[in-house]
Amino acid sequence: MKPEVLLYKSLPDDLRARLDEHFTVTAINGLSPETIAEHGGAGARRRHDRLQQHGGSSAAGENAKLRAASTISVGYDNFDVEALNQRGIVLIDTPTVLTETVADTMMALVLSSARRVVEVAERVKAGEWRRSIGPDWFGIDVHHKKMGILGMGRIGLALAQRAHHGFGMPILYNARKHHEEAESRFNAQYCDLDTLLRESDFLCISLPLTEQTHHMIGREQLAKMKPSAILINAGRGPVVDEQALIAALKDKTIHAAGLDVFEQEPLPVDSELLTLPNVVALPHIGSATHETRYGMARDAVDNLIAALAGKVEKNCVNPQVLR
């Protein structure tokens, strides 16, 4: 008898066929607590936000069937990993295939924020380009400015490569430990958070959401940045205190922001961020290319096949459950 799999996102036909070869697949409508519980997977319920968890220890205890959860993402803050650990449920993600694409998105945010690409393009469409442009249309340079990277993982390293080699930008970074490859390849300079905030012309956030990183950038941290600085966030929205960021953008504490992630997603249509001309807001498109999303789905399928065969070798979030 084939193992049973719950499929909560559609897959390309060839990948769905591959799943069907190995498993009995049931498509479900999202990952609401009720839907997961109905199918015996309480331990993998999603979190509605960082602090309110669905599928805690008691809920996971109700689950007698779930053996593995495979997510099409690099982030896993939407899973209650502690509950999964308690039940011996393996969680696998897809961290490697999206690295270059997300770094591209971050560099696009750097450029579009600095050169006001979205803002001035809309002005052209509105018919405001009627004579030679003046300073009120100007942006700021990117090349040779200091890039500060908060979180030097795979994506941070790929961003450093683009900034250093493509734009001649000195690289500063802060992370849990020194990154020898970043320092040797891109002459990246490790510094403490206060120094990163004070000296960066572009502060690029590439951090996961954890108890330690929630609102890591708030009013106090934003006040330490240059008035000319631009904040880029393509990590997780709640790493930045959104209300503090709005205030800093309105009172010119910082120059601008390029955002691909938000505290609430989708971003509410009445969000004050959408009223600010110095904000570039994207709908969490960091990895959203046809090629990369296919690769992520392929890896998620491969991960699940390996996990249910007891052969997980990579991309395991909680390898301790395999021991």
Curated annotation (Swiss-Prot):
CDD domains: GDH (cd05301). PROSITE patterns: D_2_HYDROXYACID_DH_3. One of its GO terms (cellular component) is cytosol. Signal peptide: none annotated. It catalyses: glycolate + NADP(+) = glyoxylate + NADPH + H(+); (R)-glycerate + NAD(+) = 3-hydroxypyruvate + NADH + H(+); (R)-glycerate + NADP(+) = 3-hydroxypyruvate + NADPH + H(+). Disulfide bonds: none annotated. GO terms for molecular function: glyoxylate reductase (NADPH) activity; hydroxypyruvate reductase (NADH) activity; hydroxypyruvate reductase (NADPH) activity; NAD binding. It is found in: Cytoplasm. Its EC number is 1.1.1.79, 1.1.1.81. The active site is at R236, E265, H284. Residues 37-62 are annotated as: Disordered. Keywords: Cytoplasm, NAD, NADP, Oxidoreductase. Homodimer. Catalyzes the NADPH-dependent reduction of glyoxylate and hydroxypyruvate into glycolate and glycerate, respectively. HAMAP family: 2_Hacid_dh_C_GhrB. Belongs to the D-isomer specific 2-hydroxyacid dehydrogenase family. GhrB subfamily. This is Glyoxylate/hydroxypyruvate reductase B. It comes from Enterobacter agglomerans. The gene is tkrA.
